[in-house]
């Protein structure tokens, strides 16, 4: 076991306070532009920018460009001219992938049963997706969404299509203007978050680390979850598969959490601390009523309309507490 840095503990607690008190507004276009020199090179440190995003968030007018840096679509070391070239190359590569897909689609249909099944699943999921805002205006182009999901499935050997990806990609489509941006940002998001939302890659690891975290920080609750409440934690996989998308009030809240995950602040795999913070919301009721695993799961599923800033702040406090503990090596390596 290892004790983690007390400086990190103080920093995380300070961030939690800043988030809740909203001491400074989200980073707007003028401030974002001030982070770069006349050639478009970074004039502030990447660390400085990421901490500010954690503590303050991004104005919607800045989000698209900032996410290109956060995901790795753009290099933090690039100039403005280099980014124009990168964007042009990404567009060209996307078009090449689309052409390739058109050519091999008949082959996939004839030789790969999984392709037909996946295409049907995507079509079914998209058909059920509500695509209008409260005023009845159409938000997204379902045909383009289907195309992005199919192309992602064919091209991504690590992350096969899973239920819920259609909702995630929809948020990328709402954020950006062009199809190639939607496609690449989603691919880079999966990579940057270490495929933590992919059920056959990162979700199981998240659940194991969540169990370790509960055992370390809340032994009483851990005992209940091993006894009468058994099975509850392992059933929380939809939280990770959807990156908590269904827990929030608005799309802005979802984007707010996701961009924090992309910063790597205050630690890697922050999503597990977020899940722990959500579990703490039902802890008292679970222990008081001696709830079963199914009842705990139902209570967790009823956690909706959450405020992203409040949840991020709570998870920062958890990280601060964790820094003062003797942390098992696997958990330490997972978070650092």
From Swiss-Prot:
Keyword Protein transport listed: no
Sequence ranges assigned to domain Rab-GAP TBC in this UniProt record: 57-265
UniProt note on tissues of expression: Expressed in testis, specifically in elongating and elongated spermatids (at protein level). Expressed in the sperm midpiece (at protein level).
Keywords assigned: Cytoplasm, Cytoplasmic vesicle, Cytoskeleton, Differentiation, GTPase activation, Spermatogenesis
Localization annotation: Cytoplasmic vesicle, Secretory vesicle, Acrosome; Cytoplasm, Cytoskeleton
MF (Gene Ontology): actin binding; GTPase activator activity; small GTPase binding
SUPFAM superfamilies in the record: Ypt/Rab-GAP domain of gyp1p
Domain of life: Eukaryota
Gene inactivation effect: Male mice are sterile, characterized by defects in sperm tail structure and diminished sperm motility. The mitochondria of the sperm-tail has an abnormal irregular arrangement, abnormal diameter, and structural defects and the axoneme structure of sperm tails is severely disturbed. Sperm mitochondria cannot form a proper mitochondrial sheath at the subsequent mitochondrial compaction step, although they can coil around the flagellum.
Pfam families: RabGAP-TBC (PF00566)
Annotated Gene Ontology cellular component terms: acrosomal vesicle; cytoskeleton; sperm midpiece
BP GO annotations: flagellated sperm motility; sperm axoneme assembly; sperm mitochondrial sheath assembly; spermatogenesis
Function in brief: Acts as a GTPase-activating protein for Rab family protein (s). Essential for the establishment of male fertility, and is required for both the production of normal sperm number and sperm function. Plays an important role in the formation of intact mitochondria, outer dense fibers and axoneme within the sperm tail. Essential for sperm mitochondrial sheath formation and for the interactions of ARMC12 with VDAC2 and VDAC3. May be involved in acrosome formation and cytoskeletal reorganization during spermiogenesis, possibly by regulating RAB3A activity.
Subunit structure: Interacts with ACTB. Interacts with ARMC12. Interacts with TOMM20 and DNAH7. Interacts with RAP1A. Interacts with RAB10.
PANTHER family linked: TBC1 DOMAIN FAMILY MEMBER 21, TBC1 DOMAIN FAMILY MEMBER GTPASE-ACTIVATING PROTEIN
Protein name (record): TBC1 domain family member 21
Gene (name only): Tbc1d21
């Amino acid at each position: 076991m290892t004790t983690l840095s007390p400086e990190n503990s103080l920093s995380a607690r300070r961030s939690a306070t800043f988030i809740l008190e909203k001491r400074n507004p989200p980073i707007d276009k003028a401030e974002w532009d001030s982070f770069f020199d006349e050639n478009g090179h970074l004039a502030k440190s990447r660390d400085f920018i990421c901490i500010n995003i954690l503590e303050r968030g991004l104005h919607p007018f800045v989000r698209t460009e900032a996410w290109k840096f956060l995901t790795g679509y753009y290099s933090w070391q690039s100039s403005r001219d280099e980014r124009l070239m990168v964007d042009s190359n990404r567009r060209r590569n996307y078009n090449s992938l689309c052409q390739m897909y058109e050519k091999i689609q008949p082959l996939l249909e004839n030789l790969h049963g999984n392709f037909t099944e996946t295409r049907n699943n995507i079509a079914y999921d998209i058909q059920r997706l509500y695509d209008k805002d409260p005023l009845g205006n159409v938000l997204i182009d379902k045909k383009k969404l289907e195309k992005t999901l199919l192309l992602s499935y064919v091209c991504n050997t690590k992350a096969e299509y899973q239920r819920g990806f259609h909702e995630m990609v929809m948020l990328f489509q709402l954020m950006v203007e062009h199809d190639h941006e939607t496609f690449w940002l989603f691919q880079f998001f999966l990579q940057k978050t270490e495929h933590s939302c992919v059920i056959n890659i990162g979700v199981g690891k998240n659940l194991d680390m969540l169990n370790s975290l509960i055992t370390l920080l809340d032994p009483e609750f851990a005992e209940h979850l091993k006894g009468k409440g058994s099975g509850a934690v392992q059933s929380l996989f939809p939280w990770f598969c959807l990156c908590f998308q269904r827990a929030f009030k608005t799309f802005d809240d979802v984007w707010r959490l996701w961009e924090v995950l992309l910063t790597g602040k205050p630690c890697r795999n922050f999503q597990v601390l977020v899940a722990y913070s959500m579990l703490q919301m039902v802890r008292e009721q679970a222990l008081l009523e001696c709830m079963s695993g199914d009842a705990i799961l139902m209570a967790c599923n009823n956690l909706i309309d959450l405020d992203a800033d409040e949840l991020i702040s709570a998870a920062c406090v958890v990280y601060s507490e964790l820094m003062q503990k003797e942390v098992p090596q696997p958990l330490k390596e997972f978070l650092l």
